[in-house]
Amino acid sequence: MADPSFDIVSKVDAQEIDNAVNQTVKEIRTRFDFRDTGASATLSGESILLVANTDERVKAVLDVLQEKFVKRGISLKALTFDEPKPSGKEFRLPVTVQQGIAEDKAKAIAKKIRTDGPKGVQAQIQGDQLRVTGKKRDDLQRVIQILKTEDFEVPLQFVNYR
């Protein structure tokens, strides 16, 4: 019989992202403080473009977007963005939705498992996810608890627990 294992992934449901952006657009259209500001939010692939006529309005649109993400159960750790940049008469803020675990974060997670995890538990980096194997399921559950207490700046999900 094979050793028990599970995968650590960082994925965000594309449909939930679409729903959150659509709800943001709907709220922008109905709110009085966004009238005549040219505020909009558009989704294209893994990125969301927020546009408004002032720096403050773009940040307000970002707040609305973050509120909708939280309501839909999407971790805000999956969003990356910079400061709004002027573009002609408007300000633009590109927001990127991270999918997968970056290599440097994966190495940090694997190191945490090696140093703080139970003996005999191994973590292997497989592209944008990690596979954790061990002799006992109790050890794997302990690893999950250890990782939940740490902040790796990416939302982690534990899947394929066998």
Curated annotation (Swiss-Prot):
Pfam families named among the record's database cross-references: DUF520 (PF04461)
Listed GO CC annotations: cytosol
Keyword Repressor included in the entry's annotation: no
Top-level taxon of the source organism: Bacteria
Gene3D superfamilies from the UniProt entry: 3.30.70.860, YajQ-like, domain 2
UniProt keyword annotations, A-Z: Nucleotide-binding
Regions that span the bilayer: none
GO MF: nucleotide binding
InterPro entries per record: DUF520, UPF0234-like_C, UPF0234_N, YajQ-like_sf
Function (record text): Nucleotide-binding protein.
Family: Belongs to the YajQ family.
Name under which the protein is recorded: Nucleotide-binding protein Francci3_0558
Species of provenance: Frankia casuarinae (strain DSM 45818 / CECT 9043 / HFP020203 / CcI3)
Organism ancestry: Bacteria, Bacillati, Actinomycetota, Actinomycetes, Frankiales
